[in-house]
Amino acid sequence: MMKIEQVLWDWNGTLLDDLEYSIQVRNAIFPAFHLPLLESVEEYHRQFTFPVRLYYQRAGVTDEIFDDVAHAWMAEYERCMDTIPLHEDAVKTVERFRRAGLGQTVLSASEQTLLRRQLALYGLEGRFDAILGRGDIYAGSKEAIGREYLQGSGVPAEAAVMIGDSLHDAEVARALGTRCILVARGHQSRETLLEAGVPVVDSLRKAADWVLEQKEMDG
């Protein structure tokens, strides 16, 4: 197998620890739409999926109010987003990969401008080869963005690894032909992530250990 050269990072839930914050945002806006509040992380994990439109459907959002809910969610999310922490070891892991000579790219379903603003909040925007988000706020698939990037970068898919926190990350990795490891600290539970058939770990440190072990084995 080709030696790992490039890490494709998911952002929300993987480097950014915004699970609890996302629940707070939902509970802040849903009453205005006469929708029920979330009562636990477990309930959120049961409902969350990609594309986000399907997640909203599971939460009771109809097509008629989808746009209104999406815009209200985004406005509330941005209001205090500077209070969201990074996951433990996020910066250390990015730096660890840099020292190991790996290229790193953020590949996110977040809207591009928002994504860049968030990375700037943590002083991370200069640590990645590319910052790739979507052109809208609806958090759809990021497969096409990732495919275009790999084709343009010259990095073979077999030399890249996706690190994420959702089944969608594993689906994107499979479609692109990259390796994948999932971290069960974000928007989907460990039980759900195990359905992907890829390694699942409980911390970024363990994810980094796995990536670097794979890199050495391939070398």
Regions found by a protein language model. Name each.
Residues 161-199:
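Acidic, Mg2+-coordinating phosphoryl-transfer loop and its flanking beta/alpha structural elements
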Residues 2, 100-102, 153-157, 214, ...:
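Glycine-rich phosphate-binding loop signature in dinucleotide/nucleotide-binding domains
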Residues 2-92:
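N-terminal helical cap/lid subdomain that shapes the substrate entry/recognition surface
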Residues 122-133, 192-211:
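Structural recognition of alpha->loop->beta junctions
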Residues 36, 62, 125-129, 156, ...:
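Conserved H-loop
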Residues 6, 142-171:
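Conserved Lys-Pro-Asp/Glu-containing loop-to-beta segment of HAD-superfamily phosphomonoesterases
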Residues 79-106, 112-116, 143:
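Short, acidic loop-to-helix structural element flanking the phosphoryl-transfer center
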Residues 42-44, 125-140:
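A short, structured active-site edge motif that brings together acidic residues
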